[in-house]
């Protein structure tokens, strides 16, 4: 700290201002039920696109919430947690992280490999660089927060052979693994090697498709086609920052 006195003088008021913003976001918060790739009628409380007149009453179903908004909020909540130690920021960040990762397309292709990628939102079929890249760094940060804490585990759902199963693993391992998987998807699907920048998205319109299994409804994979769109700078930036954080955590070049 080059100016410790300046920091000590102003940090409390900025921390208080951030907390006010955090509480105010509840006007964008709502609750709905979602049929995802591995969950039937799961209840989630993300932040919506539009502001409500009362806290917790925002409409958030379908296209009224998008995953990338949640990702950027997770990033700021984790930064605030590391600076303040406020547990509520970490808890909310993990709630939103679970919601975002529920959007990961874990359905399998003909070779038994995950399709991968996160759609723009639960009401969309397209997958975007902006709904994948921003989540890499915060997942690495979460992994570091729980590194060495063996008692902290998480249960998640997967499709190892086309059937839905649950598995319990350490949070540090799970978050780091998902960071690497999302990073690989982002790089493989959006990076233009000849230009060194990223496409915007892949896929387009169309309704979200569902299928039934054991009397329950789940989301189905949607074919995407070729990537395209304008190469917005922040989509390349999240790939770079994600790579830097992954390298710092793993040492893998």
Name each model feature, range by range.
Residues 1-253:
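Glycan-recognition and catalytic cores of secretory/periplasmic carbohydrate-active enzymes
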């Amino acid at each position: 700290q080059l100016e410790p006195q300046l920091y000590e003088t102003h940090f409390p008021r900025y921390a208080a201002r951030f907390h006010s913003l955090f509480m105010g976001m509840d006007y964008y918060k709502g609750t709905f039920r979602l049929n995802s790739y591995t969950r039937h009628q799961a209840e989630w409380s993300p932040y919506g696109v539009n502001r409500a007149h009362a806290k917790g009453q925002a409409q958030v179903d379908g296209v009224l919430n998008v995953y990338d908004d949640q990702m950027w909020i997770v990033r700021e909540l984790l930064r605030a947690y590391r600076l303040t130690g406020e547990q509520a920021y970490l808890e909310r960040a993990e709630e939103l992280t679970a919601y975002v990762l529920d959007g990961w397309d874990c359905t399998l292709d003909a070779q038994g490999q995950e399709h991968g990628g996160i759609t723009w939102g639960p009401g969309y079929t397209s997958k975007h660089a902006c709904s994948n890249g921003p989540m890499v760094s915060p997942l690495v940060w979460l992994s570091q927060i729980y590194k060495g804490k063996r008692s902290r585990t998480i249960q998640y759902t997967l499709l190892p052979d086309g059937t839905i199963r649950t598995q319990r693993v350490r949070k540090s391992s799970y978050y780091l693994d998902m960071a690497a998987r999302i990073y690989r998807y982002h790089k493989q699907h959006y990076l233009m090697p000849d230009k060194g920048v990223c496409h915007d998205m892949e896929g387009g319109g169309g309704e979200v498709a569902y299928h039934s299994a054991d009397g329950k409804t789940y989301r189905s994979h949607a074919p995407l086609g070729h990537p395209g769109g304008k190469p917005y700078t922040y989509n390349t930036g999240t790939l770079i920052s994600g790579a830097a954080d992954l390298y710092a955590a793993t040492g893998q070049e």
